[in-house]
């Protein structure tokens, strides 16, 4: 098996399609067996740690957030809402920007200039969650110190001290780790480092890709997940020869049923996108100018490309925090229902946190903006107040593609719940489509494309309540609207 095949296979097989929460990370055995007693959700939040007086004049900080993504921005807002930010909170980020809504980077940020692309400061947090736009000036006005372009390189938990790349030392009272993930990369020896090969996690990554798109003619996107789908849709707006390559048999295998995948694949083909499915990549080839020029497959065939985007998953950005308790089965830093690690005074939120998924009684790690926002808010409320309710997250996934001006069909789907059990599909892009997952007679998950605001609001109610539904009656529905009415009636019975 080639090195790339191993990387791509790992990215796909570590997220199984049959055992629940297949969108994000594998589920682990029940919490009762896996969750140690020391992670009790009720108890002292400060334990034996020492309190640190806030003073930006010296190196002490009462609260420090490491990371500058969605979770950091929403955590900062929650500190402000509780009157605990001014002169007390410090955010340390490796990026040059204040926290922003990261999903934009593979959506509107990639639109060509004539399609009105998104740009900062337009999508700073917390606009994606309906909140105020937190520009750099907002942090200054709220008395929040932000240290830009200086990532944390070391941590001494006994001394409650962080050291940055530049050598700056920060002493903290409470530490919130919100470092997110890093993109999985192709090894350098097979061309993963070549000019014209792109990975997207930050604004700088997206800017580099846009520079390539402006000159590109042929683009190959490696990975059939939602990142690959979003980048491919953006490439269509640039009028590029676009090919998606992935090892699975269908698009977005972790969520879509084969029938649903077939419908979306046809939609992409109508927009000129080509698919190479079940493919293993041997290496990326360089042209005479040193830039990527082709993607060579394991079967010996090649696909010409002057731009390649790798979207094969991500890994928790553990960095200097590897000595904290980790969850070895699903990755990430182990936390309890209040996002406390086993080390007093240290919390982890967002993509990097392995937490108890209360609704399904298992541990998980979720790489999604919705969880980043909600985990940040829950963690800070628990840290600052007497709030002791454990986090009760309902898995949620969405994507929006082809939303630029002139697109014949704008696509927006939402999913809530657990994609397990049998499925019922209703509709045929007329203009809607819905898929229901049913296990032991109960509705476990539901996906709707092009729903109304009222229909989208119904989905989490259905997924959380898991009502008993008549599968045959759902299957006989003549429209998505009728199917949702049947499900809603089951909810109310």
UniProtKB/Swiss-Prot annotation:
InterPro entries hit by this protein: FAD-oxidoreductase/Apoptosis, FAD/NAD-bd_sf, FAD/NAD-binding_dom, FAD/NAD-linked_Rdtase_dimer_sf, MDHAR3-like_C
Disruption of the gene: reported phenotype: No visible phenotype under normal conditions, but enhanced 2,4,6-trinitrotoluene (TNT) tolerance.
Binding-site list for L-ascorbate: 373, 400
Cofactor field: FAD
Domain of life according to the entry: Eukaryota
Activity regulation field: Redox regulation of the activity by thioredoxin TRXy1.
Residues the record lists as binding FAD: 68-71, 95, 102, 107, 201-202, 351, 369, 398
SUPFAM superfamilies: FAD/NAD(P)-binding domain
Keywords: Chloroplast, FAD, Flavoprotein, Mitochondrion, NAD, NADP, Oxidoreductase, Plastid, Redox-active center, Transit peptide
Transit peptide feature range: 1-51
GO MF entries: ATP binding; monodehydroascorbate reductase (NADH) activity
Residues binding NADP(+), per UniProt: 226-230, 254, 313, 367-368, 398
Family indicated by similarity: Belongs to the FAD-dependent oxidoreductase family.
Note: The use of alternative transcription starts causes dual targeting of the same mature MDAR protein to both mitochondria and chloroplast.
UniProt function note: Catalyzes the conversion of monodehydroascorbate (MDA) to ascorbate, oxidizing NADH in the process. Mediates phytotoxicity of 2,4,6-trinitrotoluene (TNT), an explosive and environmental pollutant, by reducing TNT and forming a nitro radical that spontaneously reacts with atmospheric oxygen, generating reactive superoxide. Can also use 1-chloro-2,4-dinitrobenzene (CDNB) as substrate, but not 1-chloro-4-nitrobenzene (CNB).
Protein name: Monodehydroascorbate reductase, chloroplastic/mitochondrial
Gene: MDAR5
